[in-house]
Regions:
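Surface-exposed loop and turn segments in beta-propeller and other repeat-based domains
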Residues: 34-38, 205, 272-280
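Conserved phosphate-binding/catalytic loops in two-lobed NTP-binding clefts
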Residues: 255-294
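Glycine-rich phosphate-binding loops at beta-strand->alpha-helix junctions
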Residues: 236-264
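Small-residue (GG/TT-enriched) beta-loop-alpha framework at ligand/catalytic clefts
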Residues: 2-28, 70, 121-223
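Non-catalytic, solvent-exposed interaction/assembly segments
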Residues: 1-99, 136-140, 235
């Protein structure tokens, strides 16, 4: 069993389970608070307090100290889509490194995810990401001090795309997936099931409030207008909303009403094909409703 661990500004999400290329069996999920100010935009800013919190969590829930797979998400992570011919791994890595070459940021760690091809004659479409080495080292140092063994580190958006691609979650759909992570919302646009674009927004209003719904609507409308400029033969007809504290049903209904004027339906993603998931997650205040798509970073990190 592996532990997929993601720490946001407000919470630590732990997904415990096993996975293969397109299937995963999730045995336990945790969604627990971390002290305010310990993580800011994916950067560790309160190491001592965060270390104490993680130590308490591992001891309280008797979590494994090996097989830890970290997920990092931050606005500081640079991402690109590349279209390249077939290359050996070494050549591809060199190509990716050149794409992110920057005089001010020379010490970068890169990662990539190749999308499946429909034909061997197609060009390769590669999702690439890069982050400063110091960010990776800060996480490794934190977990090493706790004697927790990190097996691998992945990028949040890469995990999301891996999960969507491996499970056919939005196959043949032109839609937006909005993942709420506390006060941040990550929006990902898919055209006919293929990744097009993503953005992240800092939310100013309280989650679930009328003002918050209005903010979501503004984000969605911005993406809709961006997509119209592509003059595609497809149209956005659905928005899938996940990551709502305690469950998404009521919020999705309100958001759906708000989006009707644009001819777009808001929906909850529901179950994910090939993913065996638990019904509840462990929180600081007992068991809470758990929806698979809300933990898509953790799920995608197990699909290898």
């Amino acid at each position: 069993m592996e532990l997929s661990v993601y720490i946001s500004n407000e919470r630590i999400e732990i997904v415990a389970g096993t996975g293969s290329k397109s299937k995963a069996k999730i045995k336990k999920v945790y969604s627990l608070a971390v002290p305010e100010g310990t993580i800011m935009n994916g950067i560790i800013t309160g190491e001592q307090r965060l270390q104490e919190t993680l130590e308490q969590i591992w001891n309280r829930y008797s979590l494994p100290k090996k097989g830890i797979c970290l997920v990092i998400d931050s606005g500081k992570i640079m991402t690109k889509m590349l279209e390249v011919p077939y290359m050996k791994d070494k050549e591809l890595i060199s190509c990716i490194n050149k794409e992110f070459a920057d005089g001010e940021k020379t010490d970068l760690v890169t990662d990539y995810f190749p999308f499946p091809k429909n034909s061997p004659y197609e060009m390769n479409h590669i999702f690439c990401a890069a982050v400063e080495k110091s960010v990776i080292e800060s996480y490794l140092s934190l977990f090493a001090d706790l004697k927790l063994k990190v097996k691998r580190i992945s990028i949040g958006l890469g995990c999301l795309l891996r999960a969507v691609t491996a499970t056919g979650m939005f196959a043949y759909e032109t839609c937006v997936f909005m993942l709420v992570q506390g006060s941040t919302t990550i929006s990902v646009l898919f055209e006919n099931g293929n990744y097009i674009y993503s953005r992240r927004n800092r939310m100013l209003s309280d989650q679930g409030s009328a003002e918050w719904i209005e903010e979501l609507g503004q984000i969605a409308d911005g993406i809709r207008q961006f997509y119209r400029q592509r003059h595609s033969s497809y149209t956005i007809d659905s928005i899938y909303l996940a990551g709502i504290a305690g469950g998404s049903d009521d919020v999705v209904k309100e958001f759906d009403t708000h989006m009707q004027e644009y001819g777009i339906r808001a929906k909850a993603p529901g179950m994910i094909k090939g993913i065996s998931f638990v019904k509840t997650a462990v929180s600081d205040h007992g068991e809470i409703n758990a929806e698979p798509a809300s933990y898509i970073y953790g799920i995608g990190n197990l699909l290898l």
